Amino acid sequence: RMAASRLPGKPLADIHGRPMIAHVLDRAREAGIGPLAVACAEEEIAAAARAAGAQTVLVADDVPSGTDRVQRAMKALDPAGEFDVVVNLQGDFPTIRPETLRAVLAPLEDPSVDIGTLVCPIANEAEAHTDSFVKCACAFTGDAMVAPALYFSRLPIPWGEGPRWHH
C-alpha cells in the first residue's frame, strides 16, 4: 500500500534502481509456482508492476486486509474458479527466497489442509509488542517445518519456551 504508516510509498521504494514490487515479482517468477498477478489499490503500483511484466487488477482500498484484496482480485482474474490454490505474497517482501514460496505449497497437497502461511521467528523483541506486526501462535513440535496455526494477533502472544512467530 502506498499509505503504509512506517514507510509511505513502500511498494515503489527504490532498491538498486527498481521499485520494490519489481523485486518481489522477480522472486515469485524464480519460484516458478504459476501465473502471477498483482492486486493493488493504486494505479502507481499497477503501472510499476505492469512495467515489470505482471498482470494487474485494481481493487478498492476499502478492504480490511491483503487476504480480502486477493479474494476480490480473484473474482476478477478467475471468475470461473479454475484455480484451487492462490499464494498471497505481499508486495513488501523483496528478500523472500523462491524455495520458501515453493515450500508453502507442500502442506496443501494434504486434502485436509485449506490454507498455508509462512511464519518466521521474531528476532527483535520490540516486534513482539507492537501492533504493526502480526504474530502467530503455532503448534510446532520437534524439528517440524509445518505446524497448525492456532491463532493470529496484533497484540503480544503469551508464550513459553522457544521462539515467537511473526506472520
Model segments located where?
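Short phosphate-binding loop-to-helix
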Residues: 44-89, 93-103
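N-terminal glycine-rich phosphate-binding loop and ensuing alpha1 helix
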Residues: 1-40
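Short, high-confidence coil segments that cap the C-terminus of an alpha-helix
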Residues: 33, 81-83, 110-114
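Conserved core of the sugar-phosphate nucleotidyltransferase
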Residues: 96-167
